[in-house]
């Protein structure tokens, strides 16, 4: 049975982990979201978020976007290849509703599936 938890081992926590991804990333871009990925040797995917106050002014909007990103990752983590991902949200994502954001994320995650 699959485990759909989003545990600490599935998160990028340290700046060295983020720098590892930023040093040689594999990019997948849309007009609203940019996902950087780099393979790891851990055997499972990990997620890091970079949602800046400069791009998205209000905290409740940043938190909503982070929740949606984590939720789509949590549900699809068993299909993803073993990579470290950093998700960067762009300014114009605030104009989308939740359903469109989820559809965009699922489309991008499908590029990284096994």
Curated annotation (Swiss-Prot):
GO molecular function list: 3'-tRNA processing endoribonuclease activity; ribonuclease P activity; tRNA binding
Enzyme class of the recorded protein, top EC level: hydrolase
Gene Ontology CC entries for this record: ribonuclease P complex
A family per Pfam: Ribonuclease_P
Gene Ontology terms describing biological process: tRNA 5'-leader removal
Entry EC no(s): 3.1.26.5
Catalyzed chemical reaction(s): Endonucleolytic cleavage of RNA, removing 5'-extranucleotides from tRNA precursor
PROSITE patterns: RIBONUCLEASE_P (PS00648)
Coiled coil: none
Entry-linked InterPro entries: Ribosomal_Su5_D2-typ_SF, Ribsml_uS5_D2-typ_fold_subgr, RNase_P, RNase_P_CS
UniProt keyword annotations, A-Z: Endonuclease, Hydrolase, Nuclease, RNA-binding, tRNA processing
Record has Kinase as a keyword: no
Its biological purpose: RNaseP catalyzes the removal of the 5'-leader sequence from pre-tRNA to produce the mature 5'-terminus. It can also cleave other RNA substrates such as 4.5S RNA. The protein component plays an auxiliary but essential role in vivo by binding to the 5'-leader sequence and broadening the substrate specificity of the ribozyme.
Subunit structure: Consists of a catalytic RNA component (M1 or rnpB) and a protein subunit.
Family of this protein: Belongs to the RnpA family.
Protein name as it appears in the record: Ribonuclease P protein component
């Amino acid at each position: 049975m699959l485990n759909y938890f989003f545990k600490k081992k599935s998160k990028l926590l340290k700046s060295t982990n983020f720098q590892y991804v930023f040093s040689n990333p594999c990019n997948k871009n849309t007009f609203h979201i940019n996902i950087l990925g780099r393979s790891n040797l851990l055997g499972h995917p990990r997620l890091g978020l970079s949602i800046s106050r400069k791009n998205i002014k209000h905290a409740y909007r940043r938190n909503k976007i982070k929740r949606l990103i984590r939720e789509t990752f949590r549900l699809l983590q068993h299909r993803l290849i073993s990579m470290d991902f950093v998700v960067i949200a762009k300014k114009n994502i605030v104009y989308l509703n939740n359903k469109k954001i989820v559809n965009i994320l699922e489309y991008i995650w499908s590029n990284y599936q096994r």
